[in-house]
C-alpha cells in the first residue's frame, strides 16, 4: 500500500463507528448506525463500514462547501453575486459582468480559507455566459 497512513485512518474510522454507533465528520456532524440490527451479519457490517468511511469523507466535504456558501454570502453583495446551484463540491454563481474581476479572487480566497486542513484546499473557477460555455478563469 502506497498510503499506509490513509489505511490506518480508515481502520480508525471503522473501529470508532463500531464502538460508538456513529461516524462523525471533521466539523462534528454525526451519522448514526443501528449496530444491533447488523451484528453478526458480515455483509451488513462491511456495508456499514463503507458507509461510515464515506459519511466522514463526503460529509466533511459537504460541511466545508456549506461553510464556503455562507462565507461568500456574508462577504459579497448578494444583489450582484447570486448562488444558483450546488452540485456535490461545486458551486454555481451568477455574477454581474462588472463584478467578475473583483468577485473571482475574493470568492477563491474565501473558499480556500474557509476551513483549515493539513493539506491546502484548491479552488478551480470557471466563467461563462452559460453552463455549457464555461472556461477556466485565469486571474
Per-range role (PLM):
Residues 1-139:
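Conserved catalytic core of nucleotide polymerization and phosphodiester-bond processing enzymes
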Amino acid at each position: 500500500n502506497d498510503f499506509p497512513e490513509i489505511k490506518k485512518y480508515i481502520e480508525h474510522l471503522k473501529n470508532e463507528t463500531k464502538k460508538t454507533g456513529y461516524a462523525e465528520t471533521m466539523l462534528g456532524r454525526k451519522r448514526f448506525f443501528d449496530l444491533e440490527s447488523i451484528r453478526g451479519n458480515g455483509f451488513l457490517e462491511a456495508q456499514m463500514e463503507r458507509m461510515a468511511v464515506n459519511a466522514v469523507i463526503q460529509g466533511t466535504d459537504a460541511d466545508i462547501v456549506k461553510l464556503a456558501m455562507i462565507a461568500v454570502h456574508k462577504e459579497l453583495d448578494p444583489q450582484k453575486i447570486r448562488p444558483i446551484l450546488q452540485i456535490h463540491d461545486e458551486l454555481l454563481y451568477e455574477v454581474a459582468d462588472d463584478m467578475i474581476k473583483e468577485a473571482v479572487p475574493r470568492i477563491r480566497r474565501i473558499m480556500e480559507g474557509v476551513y483549515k486542513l493539513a493539506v491546502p484546499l484548491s479552488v478551480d473557477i470557471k466563467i461563462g455566459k452559460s453552463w455549457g460555455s464555461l472556461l477556466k478563469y485565469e486571474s
